[in-house]
């Protein structure tokens, strides 16, 4: 659940351009000669750092690559934002399962081309290798977003940086990387339209174990009480 929450947080953050907003805010950017004035309910300085584009999640198509336990939890949470949630995976869900989760299936390439944000939720193994490279980023909708809370080695980081620098992608939210900790000379650190977190999406093992034991205790109690 914690990873799903983190993924949704990053999805919200990239749509709202929180990374760029904070950078400009801390740098003291004020457009159109704005000066600080006491605010009231009706008088305030709207978007004084001059964000060119920021949006909400309502009505956006979010494409989930992989729909296991975490991907399903992400889909459930995105329903609260009234998103159009599409998914792709090797074995398609049944129609009933899709209706329960509120998702629709798309082939991989079609999902990339039609989503406003693509969120990666596949497992990594050596056989899988890179799932998101130059071809895949090139297929993505212009000015869309990319989020990865799965594994860093699923992504060609050079291709991602190129897609961000060319502004084909509007932004990315990343919690995982090819090398961890992230190398200090990584271009991702100097790409302004990224939000980076230090592989912290999952809750600590002790907290997770306590939660799982609590859930197990509830199930046992429910079973005993009939």
Q: PLM features: residue spans?
A:
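Phosphate-binding beta-alpha-beta segment of Rossmann-like dinucleotide-binding domains, i.e.
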Residues: 1-61
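Short, flexible hinge/linker loops that cap or flank conserved catalytic cores
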Residues: 54-58, 79, 138-139, 188
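Hydrophobic Val/Ile/Leu positions in short beta-strands of Rossmann-like dinucleotide-binding domains
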Residues: 62-64, 87
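Hydrophobic/small residue at the entry helix of a nucleotide-binding pocket
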Residues: 70
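Gly/Ala-rich phosphate-binding loop of Rossmann-like dinucleotide-binding domains
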Residues: 75, 79, 164-165
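Short glycine-rich hinge loops at helix-strand junctions in the catalytic core
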Residues: 82
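Rossmann-like adenosine-cofactor binding region
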Residues: 90-187
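Adenosine-phosphate binding glycine-rich loop
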Residues: 191-215, 224
């Amino acid at each position: 659940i914690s990873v799903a929450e983190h993924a949704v947080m990053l999805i919200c953050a990239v749509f709202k351009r929180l990374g760029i907003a904070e950078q400009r805010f801390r740098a003291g950017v004020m457009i159109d000669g704005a000066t600080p004035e006491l605010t009231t309910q009706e008088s305030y300085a709207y978007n004084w750092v001059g964000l060119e584009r920021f949006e909400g999640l309502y009505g956006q198509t979010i494409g989930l690559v992989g729909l296991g336990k975490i991907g399903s939890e992400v889909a459930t949470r995105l329903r609260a934002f009234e998103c159009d949630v599409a998914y792709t995976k090797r074995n398609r869900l049944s129609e009933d399962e899709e209706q329960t989760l509120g998702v629709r299936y798309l082939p991989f390439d079609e999902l990339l081309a039609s989503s406003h944000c693509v969120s990666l939720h596949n497992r990594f193994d050596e056989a899988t290798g890179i799932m998101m490279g130059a071809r895949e980023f090139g297929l993505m909708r212009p000015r869309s977003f990319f989020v990865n809370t799965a594994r860093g080695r699923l992504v060609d980081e050079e291709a991602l940086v190129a897609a961000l620098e060319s502004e084909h992608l509007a932004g990315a939210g990343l919690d995982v990387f090819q090398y961890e900790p992230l190398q200090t000379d990584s271009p991702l650190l100097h790409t302004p339209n990224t939000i980076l977190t230090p592989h912290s999406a999952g809750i600590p093992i002790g907290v997770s174990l306590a939660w799982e034991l609590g859930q197990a205790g509830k199930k046992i109690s429910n079973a005993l009480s009939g």
